[in-house]
């Protein structure tokens, strides 16, 4: 059917709003892209799970999203991908885990290519999916200019 894109500042209620949209459907999938590597992220994941309730199918993946989406496509009305920003960050650090002050020239191009390939997989999947895909992403460009390359 279509893609609904939800964006806003960090911790602005984007996920809660996106979930309220998804609750209009009966069969929901939550595609979580975060890697809960520290206690703060684990707490956020736990809060999100509690907020959603148990009547969601939850998939945790930040790459090969098309494979994850295809596994549930026939059994769902809506897919909530939360969030694109975490997906991009995970890909960035998977590709390069060095000093971001002196990134080799080829790294940004490799990251961009990988991210675009993942996004295109979701867009291609959307062409065959009969439900809606709700994509959540942080807005990162309208605030103060960050002092460091990673924000």
Regions found by a protein language model. Give the residues of each.
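Helix-adjacent hinge/juxtasegments
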Residues: 55-112
């Amino acid at each position: 059917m279509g893609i609904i894109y939800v964006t806003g500042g960090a911790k602005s209620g984007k996920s809660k709003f996106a979930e309220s949209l998804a609750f209009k459907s009966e069969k929901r999938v939550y595609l979580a892209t975060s890697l809960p590597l520290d206690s703060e992220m684990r707490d956020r994941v736990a809060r999100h799970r509690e907020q959603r309730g148990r009547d969601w199918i939850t998939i945790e993946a930040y790459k090969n999203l098309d494979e994850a989406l295809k596994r549930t496509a026939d059994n769902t009305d809506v897919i909530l991908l939360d969030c694109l920003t975490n997906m991009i960050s995970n890909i960035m650090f998977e590709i390069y885990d060095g000093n971001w002050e002196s990134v080799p020239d080829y790294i940004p191009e490799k990251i961009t290519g990988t991210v675009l390939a993942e996004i295109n997989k979701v867009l291609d999947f959307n062409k065959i999916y009969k439900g809606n895909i709700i994509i959540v992403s942080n807005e990162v460009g309208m605030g103060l200019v960050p002092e460091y390359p990673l924000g």
